[in-house]
Amino acid sequence: ELVALTAYNRMLHEQFPELKQHRVSLHSLFLGNPGTGKTTVCKIFGALLHEAGALSKGHVVICDRGTFIGTLWGDEERAMKQVVEMAQGGVLMIDEAYLLNGKNENDPGKIIVQLLMNLLADESQRDIAVVLCGYKEPMNELLETNPGLLSRFPNRFEFADFSVDELLEITSRRIEEYSYRFTVKAWQKYTDMIALAFSARDTETWGNARFIANQLERIYIQHATRCVKQPPKNHNDLLLITPEDIVPIEMPRRKNRIGFGV
């Protein structure tokens, strides 16, 4: 809808250049756990806004709190200026933006937030879209602590965790990319393992596609180790993942609540 409205405004301006344009804010919030595709969608977002005529380039510059913090007075302002110049014509994505929520008055995060507010209020900075990314609840705390930010980011997108079926689909695509394949028993063992991990996940920190990537990396290493120790008789089996290659997941321990059970 945001892209459509932007494209419509462009068409309207081309046909009736004398009309005053309604400015559409491109600044957005991407909220969700790691591995839910926020960075990927941000790149698509930039490309679509470029195609719609809202951004002159559509590229994405990714940064975080550490990008802006220095050791000398004024480092934050210099870093912000440099990053904004790099992102001109595209999208400035600030990952884990909730870390800008300073816990005390001297926290440099407060300076960065104020510099960001100044950027958003600058009418000359129209050829840039700022996207703040992070976990939902910490991001809400950032917005509550800095109410001026909320009005500057009218576009809110929430990224839900992938389902078990979606995680298995991600797995299939990743292994096909490298020509690996599972035996029937190995796939069953893997799917049971992912389903169990999903049911026991911490919904606030679950890694989603990143979790799958990490598990596959462990499987690849185990598979390679096995093949070196016992080379397959058939060269086609060099890419065949067996049950022995499926490395068990260390299940996270659930936090015990303080108090007495009834």
Locations of regions flagged by a protein language model:
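Conserved C-terminal "switch" segment of AAA+ ATPases
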Residues: A52-K57, E141-T145, L150, F159-T205, ...
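C-terminal helical "lid" of AAA+/P-loop NTPase domains
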Residues: G207-K229
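Short glycine-rich substrate-engagement loop in P-loop NTPases that contacts/grips substrate
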Residues: G58-A87
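Conserved catalytic/switch belt of AAA+ P-loop NTPases
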Residues: Y98-V131, E137, E144-L150
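Walker A/P-loop
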Residues: L19-G58, E85, F153
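C-terminal engagement/docking regions of AAA+ P-loop ATPases
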Residues: Q222-V262
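Flexible beta-alpha connector loops of hexameric P-loop NTPases
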Residues: R65-D75, L99-K110, R156-E158
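Pre-Walker A (pre-P-loop) alpha-helix and adjacent loop at the N terminus of AAA/AAA+ ATPase modules
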Residues: E1-L26
